[in-house]
Amino acid sequence: MLDNPLAVRRAAMDLLARREHGRVELTRKLRKRGAPDELIDGALDRLAEEGLLSEARYLESFVAYRARAGYGPQRIREELGQRGLARGDIDQALRDSGIDWFEQLRETWQRKYAGRLPNDARERAQQGRFLAYRGYSLDMIGRLLRGCDE
């Protein structure tokens, strides 16, 4: 039971030591451990002031992690939105990531389909659905599956 400010801070720091967390996610995890909201807010405010809790670092880390796993910007945007982050902050993090999304798309497609272009409409639809599910735009998918680089 997290019933004093020091215990809440320690639990929050334990979670942050493992990986970056957003404020909403950290709040949810601390509530689950039984911490009252007023102690959570105070502890997280202090951690943010000290630079130990940073939404910007969390966004940067999450975008890079999911992009390495082969997910596109639309999927990442949706996942971050579900985690309670502001749409503007998410869009800014995606822009600042420096990721070449078309190259990410190509690598994801290469891993899944070994660079084999679809032979017919059924295969094209199958590959397109997979890549759209991964979070890439239909425009980018169309360019890739037509064999165009630009």
From Swiss-Prot:
Pfam families the record matches: RecX_HTH1, RecX_HTH2, RecX_HTH3
Subcellular location: Cytoplasm
Signal peptide feature range: none
Alphabetic keyword roster: Cytoplasm
GO biological process: regulation of DNA repair
Superkingdom, taxonomy of origin: Bacteria
Keyword Cytoplasm: yes
Disulfide bonds: none
HAMAP family attached to this UniProt entry: RecX
Role, per record: Modulates RecA activity.
Family (UniProt): Belongs to the RecX family.
Descriptive protein name: Regulatory protein RecX
Lineage: Bacteria, Pseudomonadati, Pseudomonadota, Gammaproteobacteria, Pseudomonadales
